[in-house]
């Protein structure tokens, strides 16, 4: 596991129930703070998440910046602060444009593309002008690559391509190299949504229970 990446807690491999301990184990203080903000967001503490995220919006480290922008976008949406959320979206778009024109590294460009999709697809915004995320996903670290599979599946789901979305999720889970609880919860939930639309109610229920068992621990 590399802690020096975008959304380090999502990227972290750990057993369900060990999120707080995982955050405490990060050695770099800044990435630990971002991981703590992720923990706050995923445990329903949007205000606490927002306080941390805001401090890193202008970071010169693209991984810290994109992490903070994403957390800022979604925590502010949760808090009903639309204007602040739009500010985070603009920061992501501007950073992606810079990396597209003058990439600092292949990894940083991939991180920027991923952030662009994560901030757009999950809000049902257009991705027509973004680079193809599937071309960059291979450069992402394992835990983020798994979450990118969820984002790609979500795109297919929004197009009504339920079978394709289901296949993406199942393949991602099959070939994962470790336990990544956050990504796995999202993937199982997407599987449940696809199975519901495919009229497979029992399979949808089974997928939801898998997500629940990961989350409740």
Name every feature range the model reports, one short phrase each.
Residues 172-173, 192, 204:
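Domain-scale selection of a single, long terminal region
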Residues 140-145, 150, 156-186:
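A compositional/structural signature marking long, glycine- and acidic/polar-rich segments
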Residues 17-24, 50-60, 90-103, 130-141, ...:
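Amphipathic alpha-helical segments of tetratricopeptide repeats
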Residues 2-15, 30-45, 66-82, 107-125, ...:
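Tandem amphipathic alpha-helical repeat scaffolds
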Residues 1-18, 164, 179-180, 188, ...:
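C-terminal non-catalytic interaction modules
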Residues 27, 63, 106-107, 143, ...:
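Residue signature of alpha-solenoid helical repeat architecture, marking inter-repeat boundaries
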């Amino acid at each position: 596991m590399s802690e020096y990446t975008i959304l380090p807690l999502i990227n972290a491999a750990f057993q369900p129930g060990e999120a707080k301990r995982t955050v405490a184990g990060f050695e770099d203080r800044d990435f630990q703070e971002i991981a703590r903000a992720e923990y706050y967001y995923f445990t329903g503490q949007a205000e606490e998440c927002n306080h941390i995220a805001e401090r890193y919006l202008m970071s010169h480290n693209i991984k810290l910046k994109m992490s903070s922008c994403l957390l800022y976008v979604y925590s502010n949406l949760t808090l009903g602060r639309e204007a602040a959320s739009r500010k985070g979206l603009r920061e992501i778009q501007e950073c992606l444009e810079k990396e597209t024109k003058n990439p600092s590294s292949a990894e940083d460009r991939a991180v920027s593309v991923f952030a662009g999709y994560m901030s757009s697809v999950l809000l049902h915004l257009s991705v027509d002008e973004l680079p193809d995320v599937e071309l960059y996903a291979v450069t992402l670290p394992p835990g983020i690559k798994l979450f990118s599979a969820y984002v790609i599946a979500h795109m297919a789901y929004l197009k009504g391509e339920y079978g394709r979305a289901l296949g993406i999720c199942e393949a991602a889970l099959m070939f994962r190299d470790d336990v990544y609880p956050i990504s796995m919860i999202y993937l199982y939930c997407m599987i449940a949504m696809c199975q519901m639309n495919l009229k497979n109610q029992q399979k949808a229920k089974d997928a939801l229970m898998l997500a629940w068992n990961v989350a409740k621990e």
